[in-house]
């Protein structure tokens, strides 16, 4: 889900061919329905929306938000996930996530695409496989999760300076991430097929120094509640109240929950949702 402009919200309906458009009051108005297996969204904040798709060996679709029609595409790596628009370029995280079922290997690259011409300019090899999930952005800095292979290759966190296209790798996952001020708040979920267990970690990264602190900093009290959750599924901080919200997918087949915490990490509310797997929150004034 993404705020395209002051009056339009776009939602990529996971594992479908549909992007649903709505007003901020929740009224659905139209849809783009011809992007198979669509994934993540980015916008230039003006006239265009960009969507990654796992179909056709992996591509990005460019949509004119005035007509809701696809006007161009660009092939990138296999199974592209996160996408961000920065300074006329698109940064696209390639996963190769279907590697276990197909003949291609996992991807470890970030495709850089000219947003105007929709031509791939380069691929930056991070050396970290399976760049899976939504990305967090703070100014020119981008936080990307490398999920590994759940066996021998451990998950990692990749942080890129999009202005210089330089990056740094950290030895912990950033499965769920958000930006607040000049910091990234990171929840890592490390799963092992060998043991069948999840391990949850938390870190705060200061920018631009990339200094890392274990835990959630001033929200340290949140970890007590996260440890009780069945399946932590997202972390978000309101830019208006500084409240932190953590979602719990629970069993992935029943109603999810959202936990609200104060700016000092005190639990304020728990919300039981109608839907399952609450993975995104959009804040509006």
What are the language-model segments listed below?
Residues 1-285:
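Predominantly soluble domains enriched in secretory-pathway, periplasmic, or organellar proteins
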């Amino acid at each position: 889900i993404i705020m395209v402009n002051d009056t339009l919200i776009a939602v990529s309906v996971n594992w479908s061919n549909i992007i649903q458009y709505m007003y901020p009051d929740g009224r659905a108005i139209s849809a783009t329905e011809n992007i198979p297996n669509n994934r993540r969204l980015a916008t230039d904040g003006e006239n265009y929306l960009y969507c990654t798709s796992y179909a056709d060996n992996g591509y990005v679709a460019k949509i004119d938000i005035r007509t809701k029609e696809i006007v161009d595409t660009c092939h990138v790596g296999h199974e592209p996930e996160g996408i961000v628009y920065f300074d006329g370029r698109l940064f696209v995280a390639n996963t190769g996530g279907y590697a276990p079922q197909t003949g291609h290997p996992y991807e470890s690259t970030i495709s850089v695409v000219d947003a105007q011409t929709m031509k791939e300019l380069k691929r930056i090899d991070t050396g970290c496989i399976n760049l899976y999930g939504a990305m967090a952005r703070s100014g020119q800095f981008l936080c990307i999760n490398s999920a590994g292979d759940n066996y021998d290759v451990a998950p990692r966190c990749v942080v890129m300076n999009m202005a210089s296209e330089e990056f740094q790798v950290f030895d912990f996952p950033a499965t769920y991430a958000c930006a607040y001020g000049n910091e990234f708040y990171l929840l890592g979920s490390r799963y092992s097929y060998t043991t069948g267990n999840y391990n949850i970690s938390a870190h705060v990264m200061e920018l631009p120094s990339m200094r890392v602190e274990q835990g959630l900093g001033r929200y340290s009290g949140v970890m007590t509640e996260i440890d009780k959750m069945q399946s932590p599924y997202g972390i978000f901080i309101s830019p208006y109240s500084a409240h932190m919200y953590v979602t719990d997918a629970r069993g992935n087949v029943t109603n999810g929950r959202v936990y609200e915490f104060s700016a000092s990490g005190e639990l304020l509310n728990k919300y039981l949702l109608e839907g399952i797997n609450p993975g995104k929150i959009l804040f509006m004034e």
